[in-house]
Amino acid sequence: MSSFHQNSSYMEDADYPGYSGSRNHTHNYLETQDYPEFPGSQNNPGFHHPRSNPHSSGSRTNPDYPYFQEEPDYPGSLSNTVYQDTRSHPFSAHSRTRPDYESSIEPDYNDFRSESYHAGLPMEPDYPGSQSHPGFAGVGRSSMNYTGPRTNLGYLGSLEEPDYPGAQDNSYYHSGSRPHSNLPGSRRDAGYAGSRINSYPDDLGEPDYPGAENQPNSPRFYGKPDYPGAEEGDGYSSSKSLAVIRRGNGPFGMLGRRNEDYPEGIGMVSMEMAGDPRNGYVNPAYTRRISPVCPDRNLLLCAHDWHTSVQGQKLIASLIPMTTRDRIKTIRNQPRTMQEKRELRKIVDKEKNKQSHGILEANCCAQCLGSLSLTYRRTRNGLSELLNYITLWQKRFKVIGGKFGTSVLSYFSFLRWLLKFNIFSFVMNFSFIIIPQFTVGAKNTLQFTGLEFFTGAGYFGDTVMYYGFYTNSTIRHRMGGASYNMQLAYIFTIGACLVVCFFSLLFSMAKYFRNNFINPHIYSRGIAKLIFCWDFTVTHEKAVKLKQKNLSTEIRENLSELRQENYRLTFNQQLTRFSAHVAAWLVSTGVTAACCVAVYYLAEYNSEFLKTHRNPGAVLLLPFVVSCINLAVPRFYSMFRLVERYEIPRQEVYVLLVRNIFLKISIVGILCYYWLNIVALSGEECWETLIGQDIYRLLLMDFVFSLADSLLGEFLRRLIGMKFTSLSLQEFDIARNVLELIYAQTLTWLGIFFCPLLPFIQMITLFIMFYVKNVSLMMNFQPPSKAWRASQMITFFIFLLFFPSFTGVLCTLAITIWRLKPSADCGPFRGLPSFIQSIYSWIDTLSRRPGYLWVVWIYQNLIGSVHFFFILTLIVLIITYLYWQITEGRKVMIRLLHEQIINEGKDKMFLIEKLTKLQDMEKRVNPSALDLERREVEPQIPLHLEELGAAPDLRLRRSAQEENPIA
């Protein structure tokens, strides 16, 4: 029956001697490989109508047979003349060729799939239970009002659209137009024998039960041999198995070839439900609605039975002898889902434990070490995920980066990086300096007026905020107990903070340099990340929009870099640009020099004025002027872009950064010169506290100006841009804002010796400035008009912070500690000739104790030796040069490898073109060979691909039958 629908004859029957699937064509069909010869078999010589008997009257090989090799001759066959109900008999009551035959070519059961009814065709079976049997329930199909045909507009499943659950055009589940799911004849009626829920794709080859994907172990489809021993039979483990008798429970019984008592009842298509447990075959779609199916039988591992397949067992066997690291790496590289990888790892571990059960004691230490290593990795990964989750401002960073790009985001990243420095410095100072001082500090008797917040003097002068409040005595709480030397604690704590900052800056520069300068994205530009980086776990609408903005911004940055590489200037344009750059540098340098001179003379004048006038507000004059200069001059520098016209935004930012840092560091350098040569030598009572108060006022005034500029200045600029459309909205000035951070951090490091609480003040200002800048950015600024990647900006920011800011601070503090004399009446170093003298005294004390002579040797030969520092500096320079050469070599190697990849791609394209030309030439010379090769390839098409084209093929076949019923 199955082959009939495909070929309109029984030529493809597995019983036929010329059948292509027969394994023994030369030894008669009786000797076909492993075919059972049960009683009643057509191949049984005792059977009275064996088709293999050439002298049988009904044999198809008998030349006298009227339908020689055309029609099957088993009882009930279409051409069997003795069969009463044969449809080929012109006078049979149920013959389709009879003039008064009611039924058409198409089956007339209620779940009939045809689009119209037609005249009868003598090639359709009409035995009882047949789809075309006239006694079938319902009116004949010759009636146009028949409720079953799909040409009836009232029929629920008309026009050949699948109406089973999950169908794409099933309106029953959406619009409710198919309310009767159990209507007799409906394909959704599971109890009906011809229902399409039947997994055996007898009805036009496509099962429609829920979740059906043509299970590989299900009974065979039409056109494929399904008897035991068939070559393509997946459902049978042996070719020598007995005949599979499928019992039926249809409403009309199982007559004809479906009857198990019938001689040819082998491998016939059953009308029974696939999920009926009595059959022994349980459809996975009913037991597991979403069972993964492996449509391709040649895959390495199938989703549901990968561990039982040969390939799966080989993979498991190859993973067992591997080390833990190699096994994890191999499993990670498998093209499987995470769930399948976990299951594979569990199976391998289980098998490995079984094999290693006998040598468990010998490998106990190795297993313990492996368990500890695994626990350590998991703990480290968990802590890393936790730190990433609780990282400060992580969500806000994503929003900023998505809307304004990495260039603007670099400012906020730098701000957060500076905040970490100040938190560390504050914790160190608070733990080792401030807390011990609280235990011995005297009560402050000065009155607090509120003006101290701006001036830093008055009430704050007699607190732990400034250097002059700290004691110079050794703290002891009881006689004979432990002592705490405040001089050593003060200088070692400040020194430790600066040393940690020094190495942190070095390592940070090295890390960012490695990530941003030695980067394969220089050549690939991260195109793969842009294409494959979408996170399908993101379902929230707001998060999806943010992700889209991030991707669009990165694409714009990539395109901008590509345009910049292809941009070239003529000689005249280059000469004009060079002249503009030189003029801008000359003007900016002159403005910086003028500002430095003005600040120096203002500081001297203000000092003389304060000696004669005790006005508390007069101390704010110098910080106010310096802050005005820092606010106005960088904006003046920003106007140079109209003349210089940089095509690459990164170059413009770098130039502005250098000009602004030169301005700010020059002003700070002039102030340091003023403090160390004027204030420190003026004979003031506590000059260290005065310097600390000046630095506090500068830092506070800079914060106030930045706050006012963000809340008022940028807001007014936005209103002006909205009023005058020619000006448009402003863009975030990265160079100016970053220089404000560098300037403030330089003052913090410079004043940490004179004002130990200055890191705490800077920490508060940075925290407030982040939120203020964030709000101002979202309200008052537009995204950069020229998108550009700022991956190297953080490295440049840290470099500017290290040099000249941090190195300048170290030089200033070194001069203070080694050259200047402390105040005689305040501070922990009072009465000493220099600050470093406290270290000398401590070393002399240790030299008289035999147990601490190693400390004395280290100080005298390493720390206090000029030769040691010279050798150390030379070693550092040599190592730096070597690493620089290694870096350059890696850059060259990366470039060569990139070129090699490009050349290999070109070679492959060349070979593909050559192969295509050769195939075209061979096709023109010998087209028959290609047709033969195509025929050999077509049977290898996967089953699920055949099913996709099955329904259209049947429709075309029915159309041909309609046009020529006799054919």
Curated annotation (Swiss-Prot):
Ranges annotated as spanning the membrane: 421-441, 450-470, 488-508, 582-602, 617-637, 661-681, 695-715, 750-770, 797-817, 862-882
Keyword flag Transmembrane helix: yes
Sorted UniProt keywords: Membrane, Transmembrane, Transmembrane helix
Subcellular location: Membrane
Extracellular topological intervals: 1-420, 471-487, 603-616, 682-694, 771-796, 883-967
Polar residues biased stretches: 1-10, 21-31, 53-62, 168-184
GO cellular-component term (any): plasma membrane
Membrane topology value: Multi-pass membrane protein
Main subcellular location of this protein, as a coarse class: membrane
Disordered as annotated region, ranges: 1-240
Spans within the Cytoplasmic topological domain: 442-449, 509-581, 638-660, 716-749, 818-861
InterPro entries in UniProt: TMC (IPR038900), TMC_dom (IPR012496)
Tissue spec. comment: Ubiquitously expressed.
Family classification: Belongs to the TMC family.
Role: Probable component of an ion channel. Molecular function hasn't been characterized yet.
Protein name: Transmembrane channel-like protein 5
Gene name per UniProt: Tmc5
